[in-house]
Amino acid sequence: VGIDVRVLARAPGPDGGVLVAHLLVDCRDAMGANLVNTLCEALADRVARIAGGRPGLRILSNLTDRRTVTVRCSIDDAQLACEDAAGPEVRAAIAAASRFAELDPYRAATHNKGIMNGVDAVLVATGQDWRAVEAGAHAFACRGGAYRPLAVWRERPGGGGLDGELVMPLAVGTVGGALHVHPGARLALELAGTERADRLAALAGAANLTTNLT
């Protein structure tokens, strides 16, 4: 738990200075929206007094860049081979397509859409707020000032296979929210063996990387 502060605009100006205070909360196995919003409401007036201003919005952000998941995989050429192409040829083509997505935001949008095909399926089945994750993922993809792919694929150094890595924000929960009244979501969590939020995030991340490859 902590606080980060950013100054977005300094006085003088039409609205004076604009300061943002980020309340960082470890939500454990909850998605945490209700908890964070409640804390923001409770602390807003105190923070405003300290800053010498007035409180504005008191709400969570769906750009949860402190709550990311990282998934990696390595695939041998033999597993990449198909009827129409040998493994090294497939490997080179996938790496080239990934590089294209890194260079071109138009390609990156479709690249990331394929990733979200996987995560949305997992999130809907397990009763998560998939719209929040979508919003955060696309904002995260733009964090450097240009729209970038959430997953990248590289030819293995020395050849012989393909390495993939996905990094994206994934705020999910296995307790709280609507889960206690959603028997289908509870069953999906039990079938997946995901009692903890970090395990659910890892599962969703693995689905993301898989759908991006296929």
Predicted feature residues:
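Intrinsically disordered, low-complexity linker/loop segments enriched in Gly/Pro
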Residues: 1-43
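Polar low-complexity intrinsically disordered regions
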Residues: 12-14, 156-161, 214
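Hydrophobic alpha-helical segments, principally membrane-spanning helices and signal/leader peptides
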Residues: 17, 96, 197-199
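Generic hydrophobic alpha-helical membrane-segment signal
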Residues: 20, 99-102, 200
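Short, flexible active-site loop motifs that bind/organize anionic cofactors or intermediates
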Residues: 26, 105, 206
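Glycine-rich anion/phosphate-binding loop at the beta-strand->alpha-helix junction
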Residues: 29-31, 36-181
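Catalytic-core signal marking the mid-to-C-terminal active-site face
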Residues: 162-163, 169-214
